[in-house]
């Protein structure tokens, strides 16, 4: 076990939209340390969103994130020799992390030709409260609701 908790690294806001969440999205899209490529993908997707909706892409992205981020999740807790799925509230930092992780993972598995297209379409779907990322959130909430009986095991 580690002696003390690792300090949180400071993430700088991205230069184009001046948003920390956009920087975290770029970091999540990035593969093999190629931040330039990841930034092109994200900014290209945002440009597509702007062309498709005519709205500010940052606002569309924030709406999408609100629709993706979970409020509750289940955690395994061992009590008396059996494991229970205990519903717990998700901390704000983890909400954002899970939302970004689900968004990028699901965008990668979509069928469109380029990652830019996939990301743009998934963000638009999420902003309209449809799409696989929103379904993932609903499934997580359903699991928490189904295991509500074990909420008293919360720690």
From Swiss-Prot:
InterPro entries in the record: Ribosomal_uS7, Ribosomal_uS7_bac/org-type, Ribosomal_uS7_CS, Ribosomal_uS7_dom, Ribosomal_uS7_dom_sf
Pfam families: Ribosomal_S7
GO cellular component, one term: small ribosomal subunit
GO function term, MF aspect, one: tRNA binding
Domain of life: Bacteria
UniProt cross-references to SUPFAM superfamilies, sorted A to Z: Ribosomal protein S7 (SSF47973)
Biological process terms in GO annotation: translation
NCBIfam families according to UniProt: rpsG_bact
Subunit details: Part of the 30S ribosomal subunit. Contacts proteins S9 and S11.
Functional description taken from the UniProt entry: One of the primary rRNA binding proteins, it binds directly to 16S rRNA where it nucleates assembly of the head domain of the 30S subunit. Is located at the subunit interface close to the decoding center, probably blocks exit of the E-site tRNA.
Name of the protein described by the UniProt record: Small ribosomal subunit protein uS7
Originating organism: Lactococcus lactis subsp. cremoris (strain MG1363)
Organism placement in taxonomy: Bacteria, Bacillati, Bacillota, Bacilli, Lactobacillales
Protein's gene: rpsG
């Amino acid at each position: 076990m580690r002696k003390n908790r690792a300090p949180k690294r400071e993430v700088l806001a991205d230069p184009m939209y001046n948003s920390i969440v956009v920087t975290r999205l770029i970091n999540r899209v990035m593969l093999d340390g190629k931040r330039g490529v990841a930034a092109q993908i994200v900014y290209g997707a945002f440009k597509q969103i702007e062309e498709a909706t005519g709205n500010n892409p940052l606002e569309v992205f924030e709406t999408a994130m609100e629709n993706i981020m979970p409020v509750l999740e289940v955690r395994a807790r061992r009590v008396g020799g059996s494991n229970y799925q205990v519903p717990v509230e998700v901390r704000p930092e983890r909400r954002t992390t899970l939302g970004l992780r689900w968004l990028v993972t699901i965008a990668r598995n979509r069928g469109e030709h380029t990652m830019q297209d996939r990301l743009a379409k998934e963000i638009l779907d999420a902003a309209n409260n449809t799409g696989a990322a929103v379904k993932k959130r609903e499934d997580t909430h359903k699991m928490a609701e189904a295991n509500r009986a074990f909420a008293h095991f919360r720690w």
